[in-house]
Every structure is written in structure tokens, then in C-alpha cells.
């Protein structure tokens, strides 16, 4: 006996909840390491700020939308876990990172959501409110999927997958597949569309992981190292041409003064 469309949609939504639960929990080892070392270890808070914004918006969207229990359930948990991650990050991050993270939380998560709710209720006709919030949710979902771009850039530069766990990349890919089919089957473009990009980014991250797994890590130059480079004004007879940061030529060159 074949399942009906709404039953298949429920199945994908349920699987999406299960995989999303894993996605939300996948950074736990990272934050446990932060807790043990009492340091943020160079990790960035932006992906978690975007994830919290997306979860709160999708929760608001689910509340406005009829019978969106699967969306409400997972995003309620998502809000709780992302707030927990950000609390740990702020607790152990350097002072500048703490301040910038708190500013972003106030602007994006508190101010942004509050302003959206206010504008939607004041300016948008009731029959268009769900679609308006849906478009905003889709835009935020794209921001969440695009946020690992900075991490991918760091992986390419350092040739290290330290900051990009494979489990997280795999979970994001599976998560995007489940929610795409859920959105497709219930004819919700605001759920389906962003997950196409989510799938592509997830696959790209897994490819990077396979390329650089086991590679020797290349440390990026620190500010002190850059400041201590030889000054050409200190060399009276020859001019020293220093290599650009990130160049394969680490020796530089020496040429006579003209």
C-alpha cells in the first residue's frame, strides 16, 4: 500500500527533525574543548549567531503557519542549544570577540527579530504576513548555509580541517536533503529553496575535508610576525624584497641598490 503525499511529507519532516537534532548537537565536542581549555581556540561565533537568528525566525514562521508542528518542535530546541553555545563562547572568548559577539546578538537576534515582528504586524496585511516572514526566513537560512565560507577559506589557507568537523558537514548535507523534500511535498518554497544551496555547500565542505584530511597544517602569520619583518630602510647597501603574505616564495630576494 502506497503512502499518501502528506504521509511522505510527515516522514521527511520527522527525519528532518532527527537529522537537525544531530546538526544542532554536532558542535558539542567543539564547545566541550572550549570549556576544557577555557579558550575559544580561534573559533568564530558568526555561524552560531546566524543559526540562532534562523531558528528564532523559523519558530516565528512556524507559529504563524498552520499545523507547522515539525518546524516549531525542532526550532524550539535549536534556539535553546544555540543560546547555550553562544553563552560558552562569550564566557571564554577574548575581550574583543566577546564585545563583537554581544553586539551582533543584540543587533541580529534581539533587535532584528523585534523589528521584524513590529513591522509585520503594523505594515503587512494579515493575509500576506506568513509569506513575508517566509521570505525573511529563506534569506536568513541562506545566510546560515553561507556562513561556513569563512571557515572553508581558512581550511584552504591552512591546509587543516581542524575548524571544519566532517560530522557537521555530513549532517548539514543530510539535513538539507530532508527539509528540501519536506518543503517540496508540502509545497512550501520558503523551506525547500534554501536547502538546495545548503546541499551544495555541504557537499563542498566534505570535498574540502577529503582533500586536506591528514595534510600538514600551515600556520598563518600572526600580527607580531608581520610587524617584525625586516624594514628595507634598515639596510643601507641592499634592498630586501619581502614576499607577500601567503606567497609560496618564503625566501624573498636581495638586489643591489640603484
From Swiss-Prot:
Its membrane topology: Multi-pass membrane protein
Database matches in Pfam families: MtN3_slv
Taxonomy, superkingdom: Eukaryota
Gene Ontology cellular component list: cytoplasmic vesicle membrane; plasma membrane; trans-Golgi network membrane; vesicle membrane
Record topological domains on the Extracellular side: 1-7, 64-69, 125-131, 187-189
Membrane-spanning intervals of the chain: 8-28, 43-63, 70-90, 104-124, 132-152, 166-186, 190-210
Protein name: Bidirectional sugar transporter SWEET9
Function: Mediates both low-affinity uptake and efflux of sugar across the plasma membrane. Nectary-specific sugar transporter required for nectar production by mediating the secretion of sucrose from the nectary parenchyma to the extracellular space.
A GO molecular-function annotation: sugar transmembrane transporter activity
Source species: Arabidopsis thaliana (Mouse-ear cress)
PANTHER family, alphabetized: BIDIRECTIONAL SUGAR TRANSPORTER SWEET9 (PTHR10791:SF134), RAG1-ACTIVATING PROTEIN 1 (PTHR10791)
Keywords: Cell membrane, Cytoplasmic vesicle, Golgi apparatus, Membrane, Repeat, Sugar transport, Transmembrane, Transmembrane helix, Transport
Classification via InterPro entries: SWEET, SWEET_rpt
GO biological process, one term: nectar secretion
Phenotype when the gene is knocked out: In sweet9-1, reduced nectar production accompanied by starch accumulation in nectaries.
Residue spans, topological domain Cytoplasmic: 29-42, 91-103, 153-165, 211-258
Subunit structure comment from the entry: Forms heterooligomers with SWEET1, SWEET5, SWEET8, SWEET11, SWEET13, SWEET16 and SWEET17.
Amino acid at each position: 500500500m502506497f503512502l499518501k503525499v502528506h504521509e511522505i511529507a510527515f516522514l521527511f519532516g520527522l527525519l528532518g527533525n532527527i537529522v537537525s537534532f544531530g546538526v544542532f548537537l554536532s558542535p558539542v565536542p567543539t564547545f566541550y574543548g572550549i570549556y576544557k581549555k577555557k579558550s575559544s581556540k580561534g573559533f568564530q561565533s558568526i555561524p552560531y549567531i546566524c543559526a540562532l537568528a534562523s531558528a528564532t525566525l523559523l519558530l516565528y514562521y512556524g507559529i504563524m503557519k498552520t499545523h507547522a508542528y515539525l518546524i516549531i518542535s525542532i526550532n524550539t530546541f535549536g534556539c535553546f542549544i544555540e543560546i547555550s553555545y553562544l553563552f560558552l563562547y562569550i564566557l571564554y572568548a577574548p575581550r574583543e570577540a566577546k564585545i563583537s559577539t554581544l553586539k551582533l546578538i543584540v543587533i541580529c537576534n534581539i533587535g532584528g527579530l523585534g523589528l521584524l515582528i513590529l513591522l509585520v504586524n503594523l505594515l503587512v496585511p494579515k493575509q500576506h504576513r506568513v509569506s513575508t516572514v517566509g521570505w525573511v526566513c529563506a534569506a536568513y537560512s541562506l545566510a546560515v548555509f553561507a556562513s561556513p565560507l569563512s571557515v572553508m577559506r581558512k581550511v584552504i589557507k591552512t591546509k587543516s580541517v581542524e575548524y571544519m568537523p566532517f560530522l557537521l558537514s555530513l549532517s548539514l548535507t543530510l539535513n538539507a536533503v530532508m527539509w528540501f523534500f519536506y518543503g517540496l511535498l508540502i509545497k512550501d518554497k520558503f523551506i525547500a529553496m534554501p536547502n538546495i544551496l545548503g546541499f551544495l555547500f555541504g557537499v563542498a565542505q566534505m570535498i574540502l575535508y577529503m582533500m586536506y584530511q591528514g595534510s600538514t597544517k600551515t600556520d598563518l602569520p600572526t600580527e607580531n610576525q608581520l610587524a617584525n619583518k625586516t624594514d628595507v630602510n634598515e639596510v643601507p647597501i641592499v634592498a630586501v624584497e619581502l614576499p607577500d603574505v601567503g606567497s609560496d616564495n618564503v625566501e624573498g630576494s636581495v638586489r643591489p641598490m640603484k
